[in-house]
Amino acid sequence: MTDDQKRELGKQAYAKAMKYELDYGCCPQCVLATVQETVGIVDDQTVKASHGLSGGGGLVGEGVCGALSGGLLALSAKYGRDRNNLDKGRYMNNFKKAKELTERFRAEFGGVTCRELQQQFTGRTFDMWNAAEYKAFDGARGNKCAHATGTVTQWVVEML
């Protein structure tokens, strides 16, 4: 696939992932489902397993943004170490790809944790386990989380 074809596929993936996030939520699943449908390297079990990573992990905000987590999982689906190769080295190429994605994400969005992005996107953080706070977050963020989800998906598709 040429670089131009990858960029075009990335743009399509951006739009699909953004729509999924706006329609369904759960940013890591939206990234992975779109990567699965676009380039086919992610299986259903990985999409399912990513569910708990949303909202920085368990909706607590302290961990890595779910969209970034989904992107890292997608890269690892292609470049990561298989179970039967645990004793075969560190697979540094995967770490390099993951580092590249993480650094690009931080530069674009001003942080990597869900809370950092909440602060960047809305000027404050929220308790997503409090119904009123979650509703306030959902309104305040607009399409910014969906944009982050689409952006990560686009980058990952272009990196694969």
Predicted regions mapped to residue ranges:
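Amphipathic alpha-helical interface segments
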Residues: 33-37, 72-75, 88-160
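Acidic-glycine-rich active-site phosphate/pyrophosphate-binding loop
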Residues: 2-7, 35-52, 124-129
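A short glycine/serine-rich beta->alpha loop
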Residues: 15-22, 54-63, 136-141
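Contiguous, well-ordered alpha-helical segments that form the cores/surfaces of helical PPI scaffolds
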Residues: 29-34, 51-55, 69-76
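Long, hydrophobic N-terminal alpha-helical segment
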Residues: 19-23, 30-41
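Polybasic, low-complexity association/targeting segments
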Residues: 1-23
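Helix-adjacent hinge/juxtasegments
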Residues: 57-96
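Short cysteine clusters
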Residues: 27, 65, 114
